Regions:
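C-terminal catalytic/acceptor-binding lobe
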Residues: 58-75, 79-140
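Short secondary-structure transition/capping segments
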Residues: 16-17, 45-54, 135-139
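A recurrent flexible, glycine/aromatic-enriched loop bordering the glycosyltransferase active site
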Residues: 24-72
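Conserved donor NDP-sugar-binding/catalytic core segment of glycosyltransferases
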Residues: 1-37
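Generic serine detector
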Residues: 2, 30, 37-40, 48, ...
């Protein structure tokens, strides 16, 4: 948590779910896409503190996509197509996790939970060539 003192209010815009999570269509460049910046640095930690989210009072919030830390309902992931597009991608690509998430969110919805207890890992990417994003080259 080397970013815990790096407060970035401009990246902490959040929309809470009021009621059940619902399907949404999210595309690169849309207003909803901007939600992804919430998962940089220690933003989720700061947001949890600001909104007084606790394990006894968790909050569901709208997401675009979440890097690294995510859980799927396996049945819903498969119903949305899962990662069946894998063979259509070139060997050097990125964004397959984003592609799968966008498909699940469009069919079933998706949310983040505060407090998450999971924070930015600060590891360097193992994908050096990130020129091909799956969600940009394949049909969503």
């Amino acid at each position: 948590l080397s970013y815990k003192d790096d407060v970035r209010p401009q990246q902490q815009k959040v929309e809470l779910w009021d009621g059940p999570v619902k399907p949404e269509t999210i595309r690169p460049g849309s207003v909803q896409w901007e939600r992804a910046s919430l998962h940089s640095a220690a933003n989720v930690l700061h947001l949890s503190d600001r909104l007084n989210a606790t394990p006894d009072h968790p909050l569901k919030y709208k997401i675009a996509w979440i890097g690294a830390c995510k859980l799927y309902d396996t049945k819903k992931l498969r119903e949305a197509g899962g990662f069946n597009f894998w063979r259509e991608l070139p060997p050097e690509h990125s964004g397959e996790d984003v592609m799968a998430q966008l498909k699940v969110i469009e069919k079933f919805g998706g949310c983040g939970i505060l407090p998450s207890g999971a924070y930015h890992q600060e590891f360097e990417t193992k994908v050096p060539n990130r020129d091909v994003d799956a969600f940009r080259v394949l049909d969503l």
